[in-house]
Amino acid sequence: MQLTSLGFLFVLLPVGGLIYYFLRGAGRRRFLLWYSLLFVGLLSPLCLLLLLAVMVPDYLLARYIAMAHPRARSILLGCVIKDISLAVVCSILTELDKLILPVGISIAAFTSVGYLIDLYHGECDPIDDPIRYGVFCSFFGKLYIGPIVSAQQFVPQLDDPQMTAEGITRGMVQHLRGLAKIVILAGSLQELITQWETLLSLEVTILGTWLHVLCYIFYIYSVSYTHLRAHETVLDL
């Protein structure tokens, strides 16, 4: 399921927004966690397993880092190596066409790594509640392609969400702008990039290479998942 698919736009997102709106307190946080895990599971059961492999060990070991355990540095290093290795292996397998990219694994991994490093340096408070930690790592509004946010930025929003009619309207406008860019620009640019890569495989020139790079940069911008994420974040937080 993609952020631009009909199932996400007209079923998963609006239904989730309505349920979240009528819930209160801890019920909202629990719902966000299970809904985010559902989103990942619909993408791929493998994605869900990899996501849990990132979150569960890091949550359990974070308490030792927060308590300044004598082996806190070693624990932190082990978690960092585990998360980065998982993200790198997934990327390599994807490049080799051995695996469809597990959406959100890299985002979740680096989100968790950032939290553990901040915790080790005393720059944030430990997230004792597993529900809060789970939402922090797996919230579907940012899991697809970021952004990577710190615990100091994200967790307070779970305790004091600001969901207003004005924010929802602004988010819907952002989402429509993002969809328009994807439909109008991204498809054409992707076809152009594919044709350009074929030409470059026959004859490589400096001008052709730079034009290909610029075209690809503009394609990444025109995909506009940032606009889509902004909309979902306004709706849910």
Explain the meaning of each model-derived region.
Residues M1-L235:
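Membrane-embedded transmembrane alpha-helical bundles that form the catalytic cores
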